[in-house]
Curated annotation (Swiss-Prot):
<dbReference type="GO" id="GO:0005829">
    <property type="term" value="C:cytosol"/>
</dbReference>
<keyword id="KW-0963">Cytoplasm</keyword>
<dbReference type="GO" id="GO:0004843">
    <property type="term" value="F:cysteine-type deubiquitinase activity"/>
</dbReference>
<dbReference type="GO" id="GO:0070676">
    <property type="term" value="P:intralumenal vesicle formation"/>
</dbReference>
<keyword id="KW-0378">Hydrolase</keyword>
<dbReference type="GO" id="GO:0031902">
    <property type="term" value="C:late endosome membrane"/>
</dbReference>
<dbReference type="Pfam" id="PF00443">
    <property type="entry name" value="UCH"/>
</dbReference>
<dbReference type="GO" id="GO:0005768">
    <property type="term" value="C:endosome"/>
</dbReference>
<protein>
    <recommendedName>
        <fullName>Ubiquitin carboxyl-terminal hydrolase 4</fullName>
        <ecNumber>3.4.19.12</ecNumber>
    </recommendedName>
</protein>
<dbReference type="GO" id="GO:0016579">
    <property type="term" value="P:protein deubiquitination"/>
</dbReference>
<keyword id="KW-0645">Protease</keyword>
<dbReference type="InterPro" id="IPR038765">
    <property type="entry name" value="Papain-like_cys_pep_sf"/>
</dbReference>
<keyword id="KW-0833">Ubl conjugation pathway</keyword>
<dbReference type="GO" id="GO:0010992">
    <property type="term" value="P:ubiquitin recycling"/>
</dbReference>
<comment type="subunit">
    <text>Interacts with BRO1, RFU1 and VPS32. Associates with the 26S proteasome.</text>
</comment>
<keyword id="KW-0597">Phosphoprotein</keyword>
<dbReference type="InterPro" id="IPR050185">
    <property type="entry name" value="Ub_carboxyl-term_hydrolase"/>
</dbReference>
Length: 926
């Protein structure tokens, strides 16, 4: 059989003129061999025992070859050349696996003998001697084979090897064609895509490819080809008399530093690709630019032997119409025509974001180009001039969304530290790479997105007549020194410490606002007020970013402790700040100021960076006092509170508020300020057809798709660190019709059940109460769309995504504002695995395969370690907030009471009856 298959593979390789056959071609060979050796064979070869024997024989050969394959793949990953014999072994093993897989999953289940055995097994209560023993043995062998297939790790490596090899062969062929072309030639979208892909995977020391977009900055911001090395050179910014020196010093004067640096290295790139749109003037300027680069590059001559300059055939419009048209930064030009629900109907995933969330917090890796996919690097002062005008005139500016599942997750790396190659939604994990390479997680410059610091210089009006020399002259007269007062933001960031290498996650429901008009002696007073003169930001406090320069790599002590002054009933704010600063990942990005790179002033619900900026100032003040001070001190958070009041009037006065509500406000506000998709249009409601199809899916799959839809409008470090999701399902008790909605959350509010006199209440009881199936009252009955009238119905909540940091609010106040003071027992180590939706049934939407949905950290178990407790004493009308926060092994647990803080002698004190908001961090290996 082996020689027969080898001969067939060789014949197919010759026929297709390729060293490698595709997965589909190898599968076809496997199917043909099954027909040849089994189906058309003797009758005895078709009984269950014979088929199982054949599978066992083939499996033994497969296992034997797998040892060699590990070495082959290891050598390939190290860059070694792979021999033809090695390639044949890999392809042969794939056929072996596929033969076994088809026999076990397709042929055997269709045997009448197999059906009878299954029937006997399910209906028989007692054994019937040898026959039943024989049937039992056959079923055992079958189940063992099936389990072996499902748990086999080698097939994923084989598939990855074959796919990557075919892709690389194609890329090499395309690049060879480009190497033979002369400067000034036109290249196709296929060739450009090959160059981009080859550049991303290249180990060469030479920089591969630079794209120059010759359109207006406004059009560039809206949408451009998605690649790492790309600059925008506006058509109006240069003329025929320019040299390469003029381009650098004049045309790029308002460009970001990152683009200027790329252009300065233009002679080091292997390929430079020019492209524009169909505008006649732009096409003319494209030719002018080509002439400048080829014939007037005096400062850095470009040699055709080292650097080739090509023009993209059909320009940007042609790229959009090609198969790679969705590979653009910002939203797709055709995005408005894509229904948000198309993934449920026909598997069209192009309307989803499918961003690759980082393994750590976004923006805290050494290079932004390799960190969070949609995060933006900091702009330089000079690009503010033009970008502010563009943003003011383009309120619909949309950040980029990525392409389909198939492109982004073919190399998706699971964040699970234990099983980096598993896919929760894959039955057999056959399609996951064994050693996937990181995705090209571009961190576009501000010109690619819309994240900018606040407080720009006054923007002069730019003339619209692009063909006049006046504009060029004005550009030449711009004085770089006039912008010198704006400090550039360093594009480098540092790695955030994390309690553990945890996955990442997601978002929030709105909660009912409660004004807790409390007073406290010495703590908070309802009568104490802030002087009116203090209730506005002075001119000196205007929001500029001149002092927000991301710090170079610094080993911060993230467990610093500083008290906070009570500004008159502001203990609700103080306790939450102390707890949130126990989240190391969040504290880090505000200490090193890498958050500033991601402020999105166009976010529709954001504060233009006000909240994020003043929160950062507060963190810096606290850290500085802790580091510089020789004794316990406290600081006044007055400016931060004023900033909160300017965003939400609820926090403007000196009245007491609910600390849980402030926690929700703060995290939501930071999210919107840093939301990279905050200017995207809202999601459309699902059509009835799409909703009906979604209801047929498991919660596991439907919630994952809904999460991807959610990320198209909400994508920030807060999502990564704090946000989760739950499903709310209504069910008609008459016809069993269901309707499910998926709600993101930042703070999860859970009810406290009625106390059983014999037992204490545990937090697990609260989660059971939160997720129990509830019979709706008569006046709350659901209007069932199937029955077309109100029917007896039920409602049930199910947690579908658990975040990296879980904030739990114990709902102590009822609808009448009475407080429940029952002691809820919560552990230091909390296991929420039983409350997580784990109902995957193998069903996907049409067109979506089992290896295409990102896991996003949703791999059980879900265990959490307590690190913060916000406590509330008293009643609705008089009370006080304090906090317990874990400050590492050295300092242990500290108790914060406004300005005062002290070590906790017994950490068990953190478990107390006054707990109101709990902060948990996900941990592994416990």
């Amino acid at each position: 059989m082996e020689q027969n298959i080898i001969s067939t593979i060789r014949d197919e390789c010759i026929r297709h003129r390729s060293k490698y056959l595709t997965i589909a071609q190898l599968t076809a060979i496997a199917e043909a061999k099954i027909n040849e050796f089994i189906i058309t064979g003797k009758a005895k070869d078709q009984d269950l025992s014979s088929l199982l024997d054949k599978c066992i024989d083939i499996l033994s050969i497969y296992k034997k070859n797998s040892k060699d394959i590990k070495n082959i793949i290891s050598c390939k990953n190290k860059g070694a050349m792979i021999s033809s014999n090695s390639v044949m072994i890999i392809q042969l093993n794939y056929v072996y696996y596929k033969v076994i897989h088809i026999i076990v999953t397709t042929n055997i289940p269709h045997l009448s003998e197999f059906a009878k055995i299954k029937l006997h097994k399910s209906t028989s209560d007692e054994g019937n001697g040898n026959n039943n023993n024989n049937e039992f043995q056959l079923m055992n062998i079958y189940n063992t084979l099936l389990e072996t297939l499902l748990k086999d790790e080698n097939i994923a490596k084989i598939k990855s090897f074959i796919k990557s090899s075919i892709k690389q062969t194609k890329l090499n062929h395309e690049q060879e064609e480009c190497n033979l072309m002369r400067t000034g030639s036109y290249i196709t979208s296929n060739q450009l895509n090959s160059l981009i892909s080859s550049s991303a995977n290249s180990a060469s020391s030479q920089m591969e490819i630079l794209l120059i977009d010759i359109r207006s900055r406004l059009e560039f911001n809206k949408s451009h080809i998605d690649t790492k090395n790309i600059i925008c050179l506006e058509p109006i910014s240069f003329k025929m008399s320019y040299s390469d020196h003029d381009l650098e010093k004049k045309s790029l004067i308002t460009s970001p530093n990152s683009e200027i640096k790329m252009f300065q290295s233009r002679n080091l790139f292997k390929f430079i690709i020019l492209y524009t749109d169909a505008n006649e003037y732009n096409v003319k300027q494209q030719s002018v630019l080509l002439d400048i680069l080829v014939n007037h590059s005096f400062e850095k001559p470009i040699s055709d032997d080292f650097t080739k300059i090509f023009i993209l055939e059909s320009g940007f419009p042609g790229w959009l119409k090609s198969n790679y048209g969705r590979q653009v930064s910002s939203s797709f030009p055709s995005n408005n025509n894509i229904k948000d629900d198309s993934v449920y109907i026909n598997g069209n995933t192009s309307g989803l974001s499918l961003q690759h969330l980082p393994k750590m917090s976004p923006s805290i890796r050494h290079s932004m180009d390799d960190s969070m996919k949609e995060m933006l690097v900091a702009p330089t002062p000079l690009n503010h001039l033009q970008q502010q005008q563009q943003q003011q005139s383009d309120n619909d500016h949309v950040l980029k969304r990525s392409s389909s599942f198939k492109k982004l997750f073919s190399n998706y790396t699971s964040p699970n530290p234990k099983n980096s190659n598993s896919n929760l939604y894959s039955i057999s994990s056959l399609s996951i790479s064994s050693s996937p390479s990181p995705l090209p997680l571009h961190s576009p410059d501000p010109v690619k997105g819309n994240s900018l610091p606040i407080n720009y210089p006054e923007t002069p009006h730019l003339w619209k007549n692009s063909e006049t020399d006046f504009m060029t002259n004005q550009r030449e007269q711009l004085n770089h020194n006039s912008f010198a007062h704006i400090a550039p933001i360093n594009t480098k960031a540092i790695t955030s410490p994390s309690r553990t290498a945890t996955p990442k996650l997601q978002r929030f429901p709105q909660t009912i606002s409660m004004n807790l008009n409390m007073n406290s002696n010495g703590h908070s007073s309802a009568t104490s007020t802030i002087q009116p003169s203090c209730l506005s930001l002075s001119n000196n406090d205007s929001l500029d970013h001149t002092d927000v320069t991301p710090t170079s790599s610094h080993n911060y002590d993230l467990d610093f402790a500083v008290g906070l002054e009570n500004l008159g009933n502001s203990c609700y704010m103080n306790c939450i700040i102390q707890c949130i600063l126990g989240t190391h990942e969040l504290t880090q990005i505000f200490l090193d100021d890498s958050y500033a790179k991601h402020i999105n002033i166009n976010s529709k619900l954001g504060s233009k960076g006000i909240l994020a900026k003043y929160f950062a100032r507060l963190v810096h003040m606290m850290y500085k006092e802790q580091v510089d001070g020789s004794k316990k001190i406290s600081i006044s958070p007055i400016k931060f509170k004023l900033a909160c009041g300017s965003v939400n009037s609820l926090f403007k006065t000196a009245s007491q508020q609910d600390c849980q509500e402030f926690c929700q406000f703060l995290l939501d506000g930071l999210h919107e300020d840093l939301n990279q998709c905050g200017s995207n249009p809202p999601l459309k409601e699902l059509s009835q057809e799409a909703e009906a199809r979604r209801e047929k899916l498991s919660l596991r799959i439907a919630s994952s798709i809904e999460w991807e839809r959610f990320l198209t409008t909400d994508f920030s470090v807060i999502v990564d660190l704090f946000q989760g999701q739950y499903a709310s399902r209504l069910k008609c008790k008459v016809c069993s019709h269901t309707s499910t909605t998926y709600q993101p959350f930042t703070v999860l509010s859970i009810p406290i059940p009625k106390k059983n006199s014999r037992n204490n209440i545990t937090i697990e009881d609260c989660f059971r109460e939160f997720t129990k199936c509830e019979n709706l009252e008569v006046d709350e009955q659901w209007l069932c769309p199937h029955c077309e009238k109100r029917q007896p119905s039920t409602k049930q909540l199910t947690i579908t995504r658990l975040p990296r940091n879980l904030i739990v609010h114990l709902k102590r106040f009822d609808n009448l504002l009475n407080k429940n003071n029952d002691f809820v027992i919560y552990p230091f180590l909390l296991d929420l695995t039983p409350f997580w939706a784990n109902d995957f049934d193998g069903v996907f939407p049409p067109g979506v395969n089992d290896d295409e949905l990102p896991i996003r950290g949703q791999i059980p178990p879900f265990k959490y370690e307590l690190y913060g407790v916000a406590c509330h004493f008293g009643t609705l009308y008089g009370g006080h907030y304090t906090a317990y926060v874990k400050k590492g092994l050295k300092k242990g647990w500290l108790y914060f009471d406004d300005t005062k803080y002290k070590p906790v002698k017994n950490k068990a004190d953190a478990i107390n009856s006054n707990a109101y908001v709990l902060f948990y961090h996900r941990v592994y290996g416990v």
